[in-house]
């Protein structure tokens, strides 16, 4: 069985333009949402997801063979191509979800509250390898990210938490990892790495197994419960960070 595990590495406090990068990325997503909701009827007629994405990109990005209909390139100059495509994908998903909810609302004769298209978003950029993310020297607690400094996109050296990096080097060295995603928790920034691995499931009969369930909550961060197959609870732990939740 293939499972995916993830681990967040804290970015140590330093003078790097993380906030500016996050702001321009979210602004790009908001702008694209406004565009795609206007032309959704046209895009929705394209059944193939890849072709729909290509059509959406052609609307906003000019190349030698394509002239964009909207001024995305002017508003967000020199945005790395992979980051632009990530923003496009997020915007398409947002508009598609809104249209689906709107159709369901109309079929119920508007008995509940009408769905709203929210332009403000909490999208987090993915730092694709080689073009947005580069590993530091072997054994060094650092990485290189392409960030927006308010004028241009430049490579910045980022210091990473030593304890987190030691854990990755010890437990995940040699494992296949995905491109890291920026994450913000409790006023701190992290790079979240995901790892794929093959595991062998236990052959213990289901009725004899003990499991750990994790419920992600709103008022508390998480509740972990150890229980038997018949529902008997053996232990429970509430995890709640007192600081402000992002």
Task: Give the predicted meaning of each segment.
Residues 1-246:
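Nucleic-acid substrate recognition interfaces
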